[in-house]
Amino acid sequence: MLSWLKGHKRYCRFKDCTCEKCILIIERQRV
């Protein structure tokens, strides 16, 4: 589940990112 995050996190700050992938993960974490 976090496999893509390793490479994606390089150029995408997870907390401040608004891309679809991060938004989906943030929503899942809230639940």
UniProtKB/Swiss-Prot annotation:
It is found in: Nucleus. Keywords: DNA-binding, Metal-binding, Nucleus, Transcription, Transcription regulation, Zinc. GO terms for molecular function: metal ion binding; sequence-specific DNA binding. GO terms for cellular component: nucleus. Pfam families: DM. GO terms for biological process: regulation of DNA-templated transcription. InterPro entries: DM_DNA-bd (IPR001275), DM_DNA-bd_sf (IPR036407), DMRT (IPR026607). Residues 1-31 bind DNA. PROSITE patterns: DM_2. Belongs to the DMRT family. PANTHER family: DOUBLESEX AND MAB-3 RELATED TRANSCRIPTION FACTOR DMRT, DOUBLESEX- AND MAB-3-RELATED TRANSCRIPTION FACTOR 3. May regulate transcription. This is Doublesex- and mab-3-related transcription factor 3b. The gene is dmrt3b.
